[in-house]
Amino acid sequence: MQIILLDNVSNLGKLGEQVNVKAGYARNYLVPQGKAVPATRKNVEYFEKCRVELVAKLANIKSAAEARANKINELGSITILSKAGEEGKLFGSIGTRDIANAISMAGINTKKSEVRLPNGVLRTTGNHIVSIRIHSDISVAINVLVIAEK
């Protein structure tokens, strides 16, 4: 199925590109999410007229994401307290929700879906580098310090 992308979609294409995808992916995900429209003659003509507005909208979204990335960089690191055993192993684990909440408590709104844990959840005390993917093009690393609660 031929579609026109209304947004940058990772592993698929950028705004305005006509791409061929499976019908189910287009019908069930891209079109309902507002990321694409079917590539009919009418939609192609309409898109060419609205292209400037969509590019400006994406530029605004990206600039807002860059501003959030700068705030997170200024933050540098966050500290999370958790119950731990003698050898530094946590009772439980620290996941994406805990990290997102800690960043939000520091004054920067962050969703748990933006937090990337390359090695899985945090199960030990100490310093851990965590990636925050704010936008498809913008990713920021932050230091998470896990301290044992007394």
UniProtKB/Swiss-Prot annotation:
GO CC entries: ribonucleoprotein complex; ribosome
Gene Ontology biological process terms from the UniProt entry: translation
Entry keyword annotation includes Zinc: no
Keyword rRNA processing: no
Domain of life (superkingdom): Bacteria
Keywords: Ribonucleoprotein, Ribosomal protein, RNA-binding, rRNA-binding
Entry's Gene Ontology molecular function annotations: rRNA binding; structural constituent of ribosome
NCBIfam families reported for this sequence: L9
Family label: Belongs to the bacterial ribosomal protein bL9 family.
Function: Binds to the 23S rRNA.
HAMAP family with a match to the protein in the record: Ribosomal_bL9
Name used for this protein in its record: Large ribosomal subunit protein bL9
